[in-house]
Structure formats: structure tokens, C-alpha cells
Regions:
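Low-complexity, glycine/proline-biased repetitive segments and flexible coils/loops
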Residues: 8-249
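Short amphipathic alpha-helices and their capping/turn segments at secondary-structure boundaries
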Residues: 1-6
Length: 249
């Protein structure tokens, strides 16, 4: 982005969303939501990067789980918005063929904690203060359901009962284009009976089957988690981020 005369401008910078996990998989976290009023840009070329959403990772064998990748950061010059945390899946224990819970991953907004068939509980990943929110935790005693990914406007939710997915955290509104639009929702989690709903602003829905729903492109939203641990089961990819620069002409 080339600036002829140094000065201040309004910017919205959102990182790419994290992908959902597989195996009572948690929802991916939204990318960081950085809105700047009258931020300074120097004259000359200011590098602009729009972060990709994290990709879902397919289960490589006949039984197992997988974690989604974190989203990539977006930036304008020195202004930086990290990507969202990738969702996680319950860890297969070879001795008993049970799935233990795993804590969510940190990011712009954190992913939810994974569920499992061992009721040990898990924590959601941490979001960046002021730019995102934490993912939803899974309480001790809850089985086969992950936590929702954090959204820019709210924390990811936690599953209330066995086998019922948790919703992703709500996105956040911006009026930088002149009209209010909600972006950067968290992904819903996978679960045994029904997946959680993605957060407003483009979060992907979770699934009780083998494929989570992707976050919406150019919203920085998290992807939905998947439940089944069969070969090629995959979490939904995170939505790519977005950069908007508003300046006088």
C-alpha cells in the first residue's frame, strides 16, 4: 500500500481464523480483530499481508484424531493481528483405546478444548487481550463434545451435556466501510449427536460426522470441529483474514 504523504488513516486488520479439530474436535478461534482510528502510516510503501485461514488436517489412519492449523497473521506495516488458534481433538490412548481431552490452542482468539471418552476436562486456548477471546472449556464429566472457538466479540461456549456441541463465540461489528458488518466468529465444536453452531460473523458449524464446516472467507472466522475419528475425517478450515484501509481522497 503506497502512501504519497505520511499521515493518519483508519484501518481494520483481522488475522486468519484457526481450523477445527477432529475427534470430539473443538472449534477454531477467530483471528485477532484490530480496528485502528487514525493510525499513522509513513510515506512510501507499507507492506500489507492478508493472513490465510488455518487448514484442517485429515485423520491419517483408520482411527485417530487431528488438530487444525492456526490461522496466519494479517498486517499493515507495523500493525499486526495474529491468526486464530487451531482446534484440537481428543488424544487416542493406545493402551485402552480411549480418547483423553486436550487443551485448546492460543491465538488471536483461542480454540476450544477437545472432548473425549475420558471425562477429565480441558481448557480453552487463550485469546489476545483486547483483540480476541478465549475458547470454550470442557468441564470434568462431559463426554464426546468439544468447546467452541473464541470469537472477536465473545468467548467460545462450553458443552452443557454429553454429545452436544458448543457454539463458537460471537464475532464483532465494524462500520469502517460505512455499514455495520459482523466479522471474526468462532467455530462450533464437534460432538457425538449434534455439532455446535459457528459464531456470528462467519464461524463454521461443527459436526457429529467426519467433516466440519469452513469459516467464511475474508472474515477471519474459525472453522468447525468434527466428531468422527475415521480415516480422512477433517475439521473445517478457518476463514482468511481481511485488511481494510479507509483514507481521504
Amino acid at each position: 500500500f503506497t502512501v504519497s504523504t505520511a499521515g493518519n488513516t483508519d484501518m481494520l486488520i483481522i488475522g486468519g481464523g484457526g481450523a477445527g479439530g477432529v475427534g470430539s474436535g473443538s472449534g477454531g478461534g477467530a483471528g485477532a480483530f484490530l480496528e485502528i482510528s487514525q493510525g499513522y502510516l509513513s510515506s512510501g510503501t507499507n507492506a500489507v499481508v492478508v493472513g490465510d485461514g488455518g487448514t484442517g488436517q485429515a485423520v491419517p489412519s483408520s482411527s485417530g484424531s487431528s488438530a487444525g492449523n492456526n490461522g496466519k497473521a494479517s498486517s499493515v506495516g507495523s500493525y499486526f493481528a495474529p491468526g486464530g488458534g487451531g482446534g484440537v481433538g481428543g488424544l487416542l490412548t493406545t493402551a485402552s483405546n480411549l480418547y483423553t481431552t486436550i487443551n485448546g490452542l492460543n491465538g488471536g482468539s483461542g480454540s476450544g478444548g477437545a472432548g473425549g471418552t475420558v471425562a477429565s476436562g480441558s481448557s480453552g486456548g487463550l485469546g489476545v487481550s483486547g483483540l480476541g477471546n478465549n475458547g470454550g472449556l470442557v468441564a470434568v464429566g462431559i463426554l464426546r463434545a468439544g468447546g467452541g472457538g473464541g470469537g472477536a466479540g465473545a468467548v467460545g461456549l462450553s458443552p452443557a451435556i454429553n454429545d452436544a456441541g458448543a457454539n463458537g463465540g460471537a464475532g464483532k461489528s465494524s462500520s469502517i466501510t460505512g455499514s455495520a458488518v459482523v466479522l471474526a466468529g468462532g467455530g462450533g465444536s464437534g460432538a457425538g449427536t449434534n455439532g455446535g453452531t459457528g459464531g456470528s460473523g462467519g464461524g463454521g458449524n461443527g459436526s457429529n460426522l467426519k467433516t466440519g464446516v469452513a469459516g467464511t472467507v475474508n472474515t477471519g472466522s474459525g472453522g468447525g470441529g468434527a466428531n468422527q475419528t475415521t480415516v480422512n475425517a477433517i475439521g473445517g478450515s478457518g476463514g482468511s483474514g481481511i485488511v481494510i484501509i479507509r483514507y481521504a481522497v
